[in-house]
Amino acid sequence: RQVQGGTHTIQVPIMPQGDWTLSSGSVVVLGPTDDGLPHSAGGNITIPANAKLVLQDTSLMIPEGANLTVQSYGDFEGEHSQLHGNVISHSDQFGDSPSSNLTVDGNVFWTSCQNDMMLYNLHVEGAIQLDNSCKVTINSGGTPSSWTIGVGAVFEIVNRLDVTVLDKGEPVQGATISVDGQSVVTDSGGMASKSVTALSIDSSGVTTTGLMQVQMSWGQITDLMGWDTSMSKQHTFVASTVQSGILTDWLELEKAWSPYPVSY
């Protein structure tokens, strides 16, 4: 047990046999097992106020009929990890870390919502349910299999396109990236980003964005791609150029950066 800033970080070599309630003020980290198999809980898991459970590069299984419950001011995060089971969340801290990346192979129910909730990289493979007035936004999330939305509740998935533009492997600053008519410009690193609301669900219905056309323009060079907004995406545009004129030395054109439009 280690003391870190007033909280306790606990290494748990063996999962409890039955229901497991974390101690308030503790941080429990479950990392990869020696044999690579998932951690297996013996019953319900409860994360009380001021406690935190983190999965790091691992999987956690809870029994059928059991739940992982995140109480108000409790926190549950996953870093490239999976939970096999259902989640009941009363907390706006669940999945709120930008470094979180968690797949829930089960259902998620948000209830007792006191604040709007912003989550990151949460992929729910089962159903979601939002209690009345709950507002949940997932940045870079996956579409759930089904949903139940209470009165005044809103569920949104905001996905992001990260684009890099390269000229013979070097970043291109000032290239225009247009997504459905809205434009951003690449920075000194040749990068630009655009976020869109891919899915919005409220008590009145569902709105999806679907496939969007993305255009890159730089000087005389243009290129197109399609973006399925149901998932975040990274893409590299190659905008290699060859200056017109008389060559006085060898010019090596690498296949990796083709084609090479001649600029005038």
Segment roles from a protein language model:
Residues M61, L122, S200-W250:
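A short, solvent-exposed loop/turn motif at the edges and junctions
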Residues G6-V12, G18, S24-S26, G31, ...:
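The right-handed parallel beta-helix/beta-solenoid scaffold, focusing on the short coil/turn
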Residues K168-S183, D187-S188:
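Short, ordered, surface-exposed loop/turn motifs in non-cytosolic proteins
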